[in-house]
Amino acid sequence: MRIDSLGWSNVDVLDRICEAYGFSQKIQLANHFDIASSSLSNRYTRGAISYDFAAHCALETGANLQWLLTGEGEAFVNNRESSDAKRIEGFTLSEEILKSDKQLSVDAQFFTKPLTDGMAIRSEGKIYFVDKQASLSDGLWLVDIEGAISIRELTKLPGRKLHVAGGKVPFECGIDDIKTLGRVVGVYSEVN
């Protein structure tokens, strides 16, 4: 049997790959595989099946290769995706602006405490895992200071005050003077 006679649609294959990764935009797929958006566009229009992307996706996400290529069967065999992995909203923090990015799938056992309302923030070569439901305590926090988003070290002081460090100049302020967006519960950093 010839592979090209199977009637598979490359557009559908690439769309299922995006779905398995949790990407909502095609540019996220191009960025993930470190290719130009025009190269991805060629894959969509030329009709050649992207077997390499399908294989990488199956290995990275645990997605069922048969489902990726044909659309038949379950997306994740043994329901691995729903039982072990937790989908976390992804964001990029750059120049004090928080932008939506691709979702991350993280093994739920990675966290010692359940992450009920989490987000993953990519900034300066690290990924910060943030719990948006945490109550204010000393530690590393994602904060909004007059519209500028950053990750800062907060220390509670008497009189409903905070010591804020981690920027160019540490300062003290009232608890209500800055907005806390979530507590950093973990940091992932690659070592070169």
Curated annotation (Swiss-Prot):
Domain of life: Viruses
Family designation: Belongs to the CI repressor protein family.
Keyword Transcription found: yes
Function per UniProt: Repressor of lysogeny.
Residues of the signal peptide: none
Organism: Escherichia phage 186 (Bacteriophage 186)
Record key words, sorted: DNA-binding, Repressor, Transcription, Transcription regulation
InterPro entries recorded: Lambda_DNA-bd_dom_sf, Phage_CI_C, Phage_CI_N
Protein name (Swiss-Prot/TrEMBL): Repressor protein CI
One GO molecular-function entry: DNA binding
Nucleotidyltransferase listed as a keyword: no
GO BP terms: negative regulation of DNA-templated transcription; protein complex oligomerization
One Pfam family it belongs to: Phage_CI_repr
